[in-house]
């Protein structure tokens, strides 16, 4: 939502910040001078505010981040970060213009200070249910029931419905693919956070992985028509089942729009993960049942419901990223070496591939061909 500056609201806000009555006598956009400026675009949208106070006249600037597409400022949360960062960073640098406050605008136009905030929280409803990973953990020992298959199908159908909501914004799709590679929570962040030197993924192997992911970034940019509504972290620790196939979800993240393969990979990799753990417990490699069948059921149902025949062309880097997360010793410190090796094998093979072939999944996860 654009920042609308109402002079009365602004005066009330400034009175609270400055500690004395403020009258706003002038308000104008900066950067609108007739002088020809070689800089044709900037991230900021600054307004000069001329004020009259008992202590004397004062000039201030109210600035916001422009919601321009393509520069990582697409969502209000992106722009909030810029303001919060600026308030702290400006005042810790010599000769810099001082930041007096950082605030936000309510839906009714009221301007509210947030300068004394030291941390942020979110208040959400409690979702009743049992986390889906507990279903998968049960299957490490028990035989599957028809409900296990029904739940895999229900999750696939849900994603197909969610992903049917499309958006035409190539720059936003490019951003999501870029974040897959370079975001602190994604490939480069995961690789940077390994306890180097770490024998399973030596620095030269990490470099090769990053190079392969960058190639995927440029390959996927041409598929911007796939931009869809997504969850962003659709894994079994964020899904709670109630009775039957009724479920709720938690912790949507990494943007509201993205590549459908991201959600498919986030859940699909966990069928493989639990299957690899079960195989390792038996002294085997690959993906044990019933997890291999659940993986194929989930994937086939998604393709059937979504009619997404391009999925297998976009799935490899997202599955590879999720495999790297699962292989990380910080997140999963107690994995059997064969499972960790299998996940790294999966990630490296998929990152270097051109397409995901479902029939190869057991081999990709370490089974002997």
PLM region descriptions:
Residues 261-306, 320-338:
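Active-site activation/catalytic loop segments of kinase-like enzymes and analogous catalytic loops
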Residues 36-57, 61-62, 162, 214-264:
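Active-site acidic catalytic loop and adjacent metal/ATP-binding pocket
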Residues 1-35:
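Juxta-kinase regulatory segment immediately upstream of eukaryotic protein kinase catalytic domains
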Residues 1, 120, 125-127, 172-219, ...:
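Active-site catalytic-loop/activation-segment of kinase and kinase-like phosphoryl-transfer enzymes
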Residues 341-369:
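Charge-rich, low-complexity intrinsically disordered segments
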Residues 150, 175, 307-319:
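All-alpha amphipathic helical-bundle segments outside canonical DNA-binding/catalytic cores
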Residues 66-68, 121, 125-144, 164-167, ...:
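A glycine-centered beta->alpha junction motif in the catalytic cores
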Residues 34-35, 44-45, 50-182:
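Conserved ATP-binding subdomain of kinase catalytic cores across diverse folds
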């Amino acid at each position: 939502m654009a920042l609308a500056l109402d002079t009365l609201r602004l005066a009330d806000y400034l009175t609270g910040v400055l500690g004395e009555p403020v009258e706003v006598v002038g308000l104008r956009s900066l950067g609108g001078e007739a002088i020809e400026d070689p800089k044709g675009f900037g991230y900021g949208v600054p307004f000069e505010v001329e004020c009259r106070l008992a202590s004397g006249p004062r000039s201030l600037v109210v600035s916001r981040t422009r919601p321009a597409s393509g520069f990582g400022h697409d969502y209000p949360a992106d722009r909030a970060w810029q303001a919060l960062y600026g308030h702290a960073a400006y005042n810790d640098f010599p000769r810099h213009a001082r930041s007096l406050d950082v605030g936000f605008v309510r839906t009714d136009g009221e301007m509210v200070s947030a300068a004394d905030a030291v941390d942020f929280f979110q208040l959400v409803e409690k979702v009743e249910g049992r986390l889906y990973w507990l279903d998968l953990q049960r299957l490490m020992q028990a035989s599957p029931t028809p409900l296990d298959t029904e739940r895999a199908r229900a999750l696939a159908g849900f994603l197909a419905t969610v992903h049917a909501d499309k958006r035409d914004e190539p720059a936003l799709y490019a951003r999501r693919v870029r974040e897959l590679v370079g975001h602190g929570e994604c490939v480069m962040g995961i690789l940077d956070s390994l306890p180097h030197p770490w024998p399973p993924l030596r620095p030269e192997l990490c470099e090769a992985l990053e190079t392969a992911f960058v190639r995927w970034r440029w390959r996927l940019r041409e598929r911007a028509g796939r931009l869809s509504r997504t969850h962003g972290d659709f894994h079994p620790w964020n899904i709670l089942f109630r009775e039957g196939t009724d479920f709720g979800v938690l912790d949507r993240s990494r943007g509201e729009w993205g590549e459908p393969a991201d959600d498919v990979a986030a859940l699909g990799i966990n069928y493989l993960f639990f299957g690899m753990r079960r195989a390792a417990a038996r002294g085997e490699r690959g993906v044990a049942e019933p997890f291999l069948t659940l993986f194929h059921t989930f994937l086939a149902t998604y393709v059937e419901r979504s009619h997404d025949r391009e999925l297998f062309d976009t799935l490899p880097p997202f599955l590879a990223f999720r495999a790297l997360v699962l292989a990380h010793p910080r997140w999963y410190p107690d994995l059997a070496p064969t499972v960790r090796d299998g996940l790294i094998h999966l990630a490296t093979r998929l990152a270097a591939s051109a397409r995901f072939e479902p029939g190869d999944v057991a081999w990709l996860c370490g089974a002997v061909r």
